[in-house]
């Protein structure tokens, strides 16, 4: 557990480490008076100019940050996975986007998997929050990537949610690492998921399907 203060805002971060698990979870709690939470809206691509000078590469947008990693190198392959609920309205419940990290851009999703293209080793960010389109105090994106810098954004709380008399939880964040094989990133994520809840094989080791259909409404 780590505590620190930013002016009148108190921050508590609780880290969870599990045996034989390549991931560390972090839960963040806030208390106090605050007017410094980062606010940011995604820059419209039409407002961006051609890069002709060094200054043109600087994008000074701020955002509320859950976690951030900075690495050397410019060869990072990224998968960003976004989930959807509300199956009455959404038929495609998983969307995966693959990209090479370049200039600063924003991405939506709960899971960011990053692989270094030379060593082939990688890491993941898991944002423990609802689907992007139903998150609280949502700023339009969940991750930022710029070359070897990767950030998890969006606390799930606004200034009015934070009070001096109690700890207010923000969304959780998990950092995990994995090896060069394609299956390694799946094993690393699943290993963490098996730590946070009791696994009952007869209940959990199965695939279920929604068979409601129209719930026989047409036959009435």
Regions flagged by a language model, labelled:
Residues 1-220:
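Carbohydrate-recognition beta-sandwich/jelly-roll modules
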